[in-house]
Amino acid sequence: MSYTVRDHYFHKAKKEHYLARAVYKLQEIQDRYKILKPGNRVLDLGAAPGSWMQFAREIVGPSGLVVGVDLKGVEHRFPEGVVVLQGDVTDPELARSLSVEHGPFDVVLSDMAPSTSGIRVADSARSALLFESALEMARSALRPGGHFVAKLFQGAEFHVLLQAVKRDFEWVKVTKPDASRKQSKEIYVIGMRLRKS
């Protein structure tokens, strides 16, 4: 069930040369919570088509690094300071190699979403699995004090997953950016300041 939303944010993204309207979700989170800072090392999970990498690169600047990972390839040519990898974020070996080669990271972002079936319970369960993978990646790839932002569909698993984030991070917030479609069940969980293990 895939379709393109040709709304205000779609046209704004085209006009401003972003690869997807999803950039405005991250932009709103950044405006509110100041997750990204110049010089940060950022890991973007589920990075295709690349608008979150574009935006993160603008914030971290030339002294920072943005590493994007997605099952699909990303065709856009990014400036220096952006590394794009094709891989499965549920693979524990990927987490180890990312940490060794590019980490530790200051921020882990995840806009991952499952292919939706239209069956709300099944879709939220698949979203929860992706969220858990992102959280596990954050635990292994973030430096202590690092930040985490991840999409999650509201469902039965929400409160359990939120408690897991609260155990790992000092400050946790849940938000639904204005750029999210009104009928969408997506929300974003923000974890700031990863606790030392």
Curated annotation (Swiss-Prot):
Has the keyword Cytoplasm been applied to this entry? Answer: yes
Q: What is its main location?
A: cytoplasm
Q: Name one GO molecular function term.
A: rRNA (uridine-2'-O-)-methyltransferase activity
E.C. designation(s) = 2.1.1.166
Where do the coiled-coil regions begin and end?
Answer: none
The UniProt record gives the binding positions of S-adenosyl-L-methionine as: G50, W52, D70, D88, D111
| Protein's recorded name | Ribosomal RNA large subunit methyltransferase E
Native source organism of the sequence: Syntrophobacter fumaroxidans (strain DSM 10017 / MPOB)
